[in-house]
Amino acid sequence: MKYALRFFQESQIKEAVDELIIRYTHKTVKLIDFVSNQPDNKRIVIDVCSCTTTDLEDSLNIFIAAKEKHKNIAILLSQYQKDILITLEEHMINFFFQEGVDTWDKLTFQMGCGVSDVYITNEFAFNIKLISQICHDKNIKVRIFPNVAQTSSKMKGNLNSFKFFFVRPEDIDLYEDFVDICEFFGPIAKQDILYKIYKDKTWKDQLSYLILGMDKEIDGNTIPPGWAERRLTCNKKCSYTGHCKICDYVLDLGAAMQENGYKFEDKEIDNEHTIIKGIMQTDDSSINEGFV
């Protein structure tokens, strides 16, 4: 499994990650210089989603020249910008869409467009084993956002965010065979610390501090072993059968354990974790996303 970073100048991990996503907003030949200076094994994704149609058309020769300098590139665009797909395909430039896939029809549509990657999102991701088999048979990479509790519902109402799709750092290895690229959702300034947390594969605190959209107070140390394995193959049957209650049991058990001071694994809160937790709870919008 590889990790993607949305490029920003201040990042301490931009050399370490497997994939850099750079924001391209207007025609500039500086893109060619940037990709030329990257190692061959680092994938460069050029995010053109905010470009106008004119900027895209004017930049096609730049994308082609960039591909000649660095073979491992891809274009990230919106489905509404698909007029340039023919040119990208003619020059064998990989591309994929920013829009997430959360139904079988959306997956079929994007695969039919010839994408190289797909973002699997919301409750559809509970079918990740079958989805990955279909995608990998067509040489399509599967991407997820592990750090956000996801649902396709526009209204949360009485829905339980603990039953939404997300992946804890401790469980990320379970997805190794099914997910190709992990990308972090949310403020760009937090990507470095999220990368560290997921590479370390541990989180010693409330899930709500780590997982965006998680409104349930549950300490990760009170989640029993085996829960993540069950969840990987559950297909979210609780939504349409009502038979599976494992997440409800985990929440009830966690509440009882916290009330009585019990934990499955006693991970002491050290100074490093306190610093990390503080970073996760701050906001920093003063970020330079420019790649030059």
Model-derived features with residue positions:
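Active-site pocket-lining/capping segments in soluble small-molecule metabolic enzymes
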Residues: 1-292
